[in-house]
């Protein structure tokens, strides 16, 4: 005997009421999944269905979708050439590639518009999704049993705690605090942030200390502490070229820490586009958590 519509609704409401988690979606990042799957058709409906499916899988009482809208004003203030390498890459596109990109971003815009009818969805000009996600975790993460970050971006692992994990829809893997060494060659988030400050991030055009990769960086952090501890101890002993480079990089280390430390600088990153913007975003997120 098939279920009545009333029974189906009752079970759906009971399932929703049992959810205790928060899910934060890297919305632009998720959109590129459809582009990389060579989708040349509108994908708004599939986009929202994917988020709904993930929300059910991760028992999300609250789901928040975030999008990027231009480069981070905050990071550009500290590093004017931030992500400048991407501008060069885009300038070299063929006319066909430009047309496909324009079409994709139109479809992505449609996906976000449809998403707004189902989930709280935010894009702020000059603020990156990373910073909004970090602030949401800081502001309301403690109100939930667990927080799930949906992104392929490993930078989001700077937000991991015992109660915060990440799922990547490309690797189909979950990333937890206990797995930091396996995925990032460090023992914890503090070391991960310090390693990123030392190495930089060429993908974002952030220069690091020349001659120091993941292995050397990890060994330095293990011996001398986090990046602020290292700065306090400069110059470090040693005649190796990479040590000399490190000793000459105090300003670079400070700058890079500001650029990569999402938990510490997320508030500043949002406020960089206006205190009123931060205040409204704070109010909106707190209201969502109360629902």
Curated annotation (Swiss-Prot):
Keywords from the UniProt entry: DNA replication, DNA-binding, Early protein, Endonuclease, Exonuclease, Hydrolase, Magnesium, Metal-binding, Nuclease, Potassium, Viral DNA replication
Activity regulation remarks: Inhibited by p-hydroxymercuribenzoate (PHMB).
Effect of residue 115 to S: Complete loss of inhibition by PHMB
Domain of life: Viruses
Enzyme class: hydrolase
Pfam families given in the database record: 5_3_exonuc, 5_3_exonuc_N
Cofactors named for this entry: Mg(2+); K(+)
Catalysed reactions, as listed in the record: Exonucleolytic cleavage in the 5'- to 3'-direction to yield nucleoside 5'-phosphates
Induction: Expressed in the early phase of the viral replicative cycle.
UniProt keyword annotation of Nuclease present: yes
Residues engaged in binding DNA: 83
Binding site for K(+): 209, 212
Binding site for Mg(2+) 3: 155, 201
E.C. number(s) listed in UniProt: 3.1.11.-, 3.1.11.3
Phenotype upon changing residue 266 to S: Complete loss of inhibition by PHMB
Binding sites annotated in the UniProt record for Mg(2+) 1: 130
Note on how the cofactor is bound: Binds divalent metal cations, probably Mg(2+). In vitro low metal concentrations selectively stimulate the endonuclease reaction. Endonuclease activity is suggested to require only the first cation, whereas exonuclease activity is suggested to require binding of both. High pH favors the exonuclease activity whereas low pH favors the endonuclease activity. Metal ions enhance substrate binding.
GO molecular function: 5'-3' DNA exonuclease activity; 5'-3' exonuclease activity; 5'-flap endonuclease activity; DNA binding; DNA exonuclease activity; double-stranded DNA 5'-3' DNA exonuclease activity; double-stranded DNA endonuclease activity; metal ion binding
Protein name: Flap endonuclease
Gene name for this UniProt entry: D15
């Amino acid at each position: 005997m098939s279920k009545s519509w009333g029974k189906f609704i009752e079970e759906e409401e009971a399932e929703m009421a049992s959810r205790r988690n928060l899910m934060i979606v890297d919305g632009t990042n998720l959109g590129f999944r459809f582009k990389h799957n060579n989708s040349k058709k509108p994908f708004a409906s599939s986009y929202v269905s994917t988020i709904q499916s993930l929300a059910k899988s991760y028992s999300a009482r609250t789901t928040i979708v975030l999008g990027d809208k231009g480069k981070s004003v905050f990071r550009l203030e500290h590093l004017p050439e931030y992500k400048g390498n991407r501008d060069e890459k885009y300038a070299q596109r063929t006319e066909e590639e430009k047309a496909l990109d324009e079409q994709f971003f139109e479809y992505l815009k449609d996906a976000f518009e449809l998403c707004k009818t189902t989930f709280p969805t935010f894009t702020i000009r000059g603020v990156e999704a990373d910073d909004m996600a970090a602030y949401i975790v800081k502001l309301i993460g403690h109100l939930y049993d667990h927080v799930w970050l949906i992104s392929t971006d490993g930078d989001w692992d700077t937000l991991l705690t015992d109660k915060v994990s990440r799922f990547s829809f490309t690797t189909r893997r979950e990333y937890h605090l206990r797995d930091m060494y396996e995925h990032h060659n460090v023992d914890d988030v503090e070391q991960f942030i310090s390693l990123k400050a030392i190495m930089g991030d060429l993908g974002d055009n952030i220069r690091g200390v020349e001659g120091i990769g993941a292995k050397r960086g990890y060994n330095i952090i293990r011996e001398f502490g986090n990046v602020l501890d290292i700065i306090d101890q400069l110059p470090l002993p040693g005649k190796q070229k990479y040590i000399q480079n490190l000793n000459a990089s105090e300003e670079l280390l400070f700058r890079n820490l500001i650029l990569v430390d999402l938990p510490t600088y997320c508030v500043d990153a949002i406020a960089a586009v206006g205190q009123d913007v931060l205040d409204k975003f704070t109010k909106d997120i707190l209201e969502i958590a109360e629902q």
